[in-house]
Amino acid sequence: MTKETHENHLRTHNGIFPVSLLSTQARQLLNFKLKSPSYYLLNSFKLLVKSEGNNQSTTADVTLTKSPNAYHASSAREEKDLQVSRRDTCFYCSRKIIKCICNEEHVGIESVQLKLILLLCQNLPNVTTNAKKYFSSLADGHNFTLTLYKFSLDNQTFSQLLSRFKSFATLTELLQVHNVMLQVNFSFQARQLNTEIQLRRCHSLEKTWKFLFGDYELPDVLKDMESSNSDWSDTSLKRIAYLCSLVEELKLHSSIMNDKYVCLVSKHNNALEDKFNSEAARQLLQKSLSIVASNLKQAENKTISYEEKLSIAQNSINEIQTQNRDLKLETEKLQDQIKALLERNQSLQEALETVKNDEKNLREMNANYETEMKEARQKLNNKEALISHYDDDFRAKELKISRLSESLREKAGLLEFQSSVSEQRDLLYQEQIQSSIKDMENVFRKNEYLMEELNELKNNLEVESSKVLRLDEEMKCLKDEQLSQFDTVFSLTDERDGLQKDLKNTKGNLDDEIGRSAFLKSQIRDQELTIEKLHDSLETLSQTNNSLQCEISEKNAELNSVNSKLSEGRAHLETANKENEILKQQLELSESKLASLLNSYQSFINKKEHLYSFLQLVEPSFAKSDSSNATESQISESVRKGISIFNLLFIVYKNVCSQAGINPSTKLEDLDEHTLSDELTYITKKFVQKDQEYQTKEIELRNYKITLQSLLEDKLIGVNTDCRSPSCSDFEQLGQESENNTSISGRVSKLVKSFNDSSSISNNTKISITKSPSGEKVSVFKEMSDIALRDMDKNRKLLGENVDVRNIVVQKDESLNIDLQNNAVVPELHFKEGMVYDSLENAYTYLAESKRMLANELQMKQEDLEKVILELEAYKEIFLEEKQIPCEEFMPGKNAKSEKSLRSVFQEQLMRETKRVRKLEKVNSELKLHCFELSERLREREHTLQQTFGDK
């Protein structure tokens, strides 16, 4: 066969032998593209044995050769016995194959591990020691890396080649080798696939192959295939069914091949006895066989250890797959959380913008409030002047009342003197009556004069009867002069008694008024005590405000710590991003390295001609019984070429080790199965570790993002507020608007707008109140002033605190401007001991309620002030109506008027005094009621304050 025809033969059939030599099973196996890499090694082995035999004039290879006739006859018989209908469709794609049975277009298995070589060594126990040594050195030199060349023979042709050797054992051993080939090919395919479904599929296929060709039975395999939930296609099931049938056929043919093997061995032994009678050849053969046996034992030990390592690696791969599934589920959950956090973040940004707008409105309201305060101060000064004027009037009226009491005492003394005079007159009248009885004549004479006096007395009595009913009734009864005289005497006595009673009543009323004034003073003192208690409670409130400031400072420190943690999280995120970029670069480098490996593979294929020339030299040794025409120089050159090819493979092994970060062994002799298997497992583990690191870095990056957003979400709320003491109108508007607006941002903005320093009390009234006006009745002003001052201090403190918090928020907004735009962080608000508010809204509602209560109380105090002013005006009217009565008329030393005139004057004075006393009693009763109402209000206020602070 020439070189050109041989190349064409290889190009068309991808094999060294014609297709007619192959059986149907061989053709079917060729459809899998599962070719044995050991053909070249066997040829080199046979050549080596032949070269040794030529040097010693007897070789083991001569015994394995046949005559041409026997060779052709055996091949023809095998073809007749084993030929079955051809399968001309591809097993993988189910398409018809036109050009070749094993077209590379349909099946893309590019490589197989070199474990097959060692297994072949195990299954050839009778090979010479030198050949096996060379064989194992080549296998060790290639490691368990991927072989980068196409194979040319299938299992059947390989069995035909081995049938020419005495060292051929059984076909079952070759089937074991073929099983290993299938396992290796499927494991390599699993590494090349990317998606999870394909990985599972290849894993299950690999498992079924183990069951098919291992120690398991066939029905278990089918059960496992049916029970498994892997995504297998119809083509894969067809393949497995076909392979099962193929295994059965191979078992049948193995018995036939064993029979043929017995015949061949007998023939070969006869040929050996005829042609090799020399002792040198036998010794050489024994040495080679002993060496091969020792090497086979070592190879068996190595394969056992390697299989154990493979089982450990498969367990680790299964664990990694379960971990990957869990990680994918966790990543999906984290992505959902990230979406929810982003939505909440947007709502917080909107709330912060509304708060900033409210802050601008508050500044404008503060400016208006300052102008209103100036006007209110002027009004308060004017009212203070009026109150001082009323105070002076009140003092003047008190002096007048004292003078009146003195004048009344003097009048009482005069009335007593007049009563004594009237008694003396009564005695004189009695003497006159007795004298008149004795002296009737004189009486009749004087009767006319007396009648005139009686008429005058009647007129006077008629005037007096309109004022005093008793005197009118008694005066009507007087008809006669005597009776009139007696009646006058009795009426004067009655008048004296009535005047005495009236004096006693006036004294009692004055004493009652003094007691009432003392009672009022005691009530005013009680009010002052309650006001002092209120001051104490307000002082406790100020202390709580100080504690609030301390807590706010602590919260600011916590904010700083949170910000430091956030900065650390950002640094971790940056490092994670950098590491991800590095991993991506490493993946790109690995891809580039794979491309370079493919290039080296293609370059190695280009050097395949050396192998072809090597095989051409080997082929005549099988075709001819006599020694081949090849010279020793040609054989040595072909061997050198084969060795150079394997050296090239060793170079590829070094490149792979360098890319995987392993220090390769520099000598072929130093390579063991253990070291090579360890290096292979290390490469796979390193690749898996890199993949896991990349996935963990992605998960860490997502976790950092989630933690950052959760921290921001938990602490983000807009704090841009100013506090003031609102007026009642503001609170009423706020209540109406809060009912209409239900959104949180709207309510917060309305509350913020209501907190100005503008209140219903003007600044002037506050300043006048602080001056503590004189008098015990004006103690209400002290209470109002203290409340107003405390309220202003509270508002100032809260304003300062809100400004500090707002500055902190602005700084944090500038620093946290990565993913969240203009968000602010707020601590929890602490008011009073044991009162914690989770949000500004609750705090503002509490402040609004307290300020409403204070505003209502201030309005009540203003109403009380107006009432007091009205009472002062009533006192003024009373004292203006008062007229001082001249006491000269009642002096005993001067000529007094007549009794009638005196009576009329006294009656008028008594009527005026009674009217004044009644007015004073009314004013007194009103003051008592007012004081009682004030005390009840103060008690209610204390009760409400105790309830609110106790509950909180």
Swiss-Prot record:
Keywords: Coiled coil, Cytoplasm, Meiosis. Its main location: cytoplasm. Residues 283-611, 684-716, 839-942 form a coiled coil. GO terms for cellular component: cytoplasm. It is found in: Cytoplasm. GO terms for biological process: meiotic cell cycle. The keyword Metal-binding does not apply. Disulfide bonds: none annotated. Has a role in meiosis. This is Meiotic coiled-coil protein 3. The gene is mcp3.
